[in-house]
């Protein structure tokens, strides 16, 4: 049924090491409904004690198995849950061979496999559909260039870089989400993730203006003249009938973040909050 397209060998190796309970073999997944997760190191669960169990993707997967009505039930008692649901998780962390995932990286590495899996949504068997798609990407696209241009002050170079990076992100993210929507069909839930600001809880907090810049990159200016990552995510979601998991402001304790030299990743308690945001988005 599926014609799995080749992806980069290094990316394939990342997939192989995902535990079978989280990401089944493709032969097993062919006949079962799927939750398909794409994205960056947040989607992978980096920073969690065990990304395969306490990242937000596996947590959401367990919740969906309990709560998602994925197949019309013959009797009412069978209507609750989706016990057959399988997880295919394509998110990955940065590695020595592969930098952090951006929207173009999702396009090149993850989208080909996602499209192959989504072919099942148009076959004659409704029991093997991709039932839910989540995507978490955008932070790596813009944070580095904007931090480099703006940490010394909010001048012309900073503003120009900010606008250019956000414009590129919007185009790249729209391509990925639009392609997923076209392949999945109009009724498949797609949820895009947002982030929270880790800077108050890591080594960058001591740099004047760094905390404010971290928030600006994510949320943009209050008057909307400079859109942030989350403004882009919300606009793209609205354009393609997707939901948004609103994470910003939820991870408000030091224990929610790895901290120190890691100015990116949540801990288990942080991923608990992210999971709740995705659950709320899917409940809309």
Protein language model annotation of sequence segments:
Residues 2-27:
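Secretory targeting and sorting signals
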Residues 28-40:
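N-terminal segment immediately downstream of the Sec signal-peptide cleavage site
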Residues 31-34, 71-72, 127-133, 184-191, ...:
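Loop/turn elements at helix/coil->beta-strand transitions in domains of secreted/extracellular proteins
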Residues 38-41, 77-82, 90-94, 135-139, ...:
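Active-site-proximal beta-strand/loop segments in catalytic clefts of secreted hydrolases
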Residues 48-158, 162-164:
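Conserved SGNH/GDSL esterase-like catalytic core that processes O-acyl groups on lipids
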Residues 61-69, 119, 138, 174-186, ...:
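Sec-exported extracytoplasmic/periplasmic mature domains
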Residues 111, 173-177, 230:
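Generic structural signal for well-ordered alpha-helices
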Residues 195-284:
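Catalytic His-Asp segment of secreted/periplasmic serine-dependent ester chemistry enzymes
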């Amino acid at each position: 049924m599926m014609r799995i397209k080749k992806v980069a060998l290094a990316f394939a190796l990342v997939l192989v090491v995902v535990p079978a309970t989280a990401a089944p073999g493709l032969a097993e997944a062919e006949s079962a409904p799927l939750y398909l997760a794409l994205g960056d190191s947040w989607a992978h669960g980096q920073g969690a004690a065990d990304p395969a169990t306490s990242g937000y993707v596996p947590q959401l997967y367990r919740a969906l198995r309990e709560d998602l009505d994925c197949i019309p039930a013959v009797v009412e008692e069978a209507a609750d849950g989706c016990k057959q649901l399988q997880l295919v998780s394509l998110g990955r962390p940065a590695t020595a061979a592969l930098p952090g995932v951006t929207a173009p990286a999702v396009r090149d590495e993850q989208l080909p496999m996602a499209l192959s899996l989504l072919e099942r949504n148009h076959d004659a068997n409704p029991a093997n559909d991709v039932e839910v798609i989540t995507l978490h990407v955008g932070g790596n696209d813009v944070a580095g260039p904007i931090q480099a241009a703006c940490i010394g002050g909010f001048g012309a170079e900073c503003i120009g870089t900010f606008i250019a990076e956000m414009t590129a992100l919007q185009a790249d993210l729209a391509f990925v989400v639009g392609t997923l929507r076209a392949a999945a069909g109009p009724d498949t839930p797609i949820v895009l993730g947002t982030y929270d600001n880790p800077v108050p809880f890591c080594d960058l907090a001591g740099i004047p203006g760094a905390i404010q810049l971290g928030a600006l990159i994510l949320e943009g200016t209050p008057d909307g003249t400079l859109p942030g990552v989350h403004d882009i995510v919300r606009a793209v979601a609205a354009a393609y009938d997707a939901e948004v998991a609103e994470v910003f402001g939820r991870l408000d304790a030091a224990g929610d973040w790895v901290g120190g030299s890691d100015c990116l990743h949540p801990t288990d308690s942080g991923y608990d909050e992210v999971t709740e945001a995705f659950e709320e988005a899917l409940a809309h």
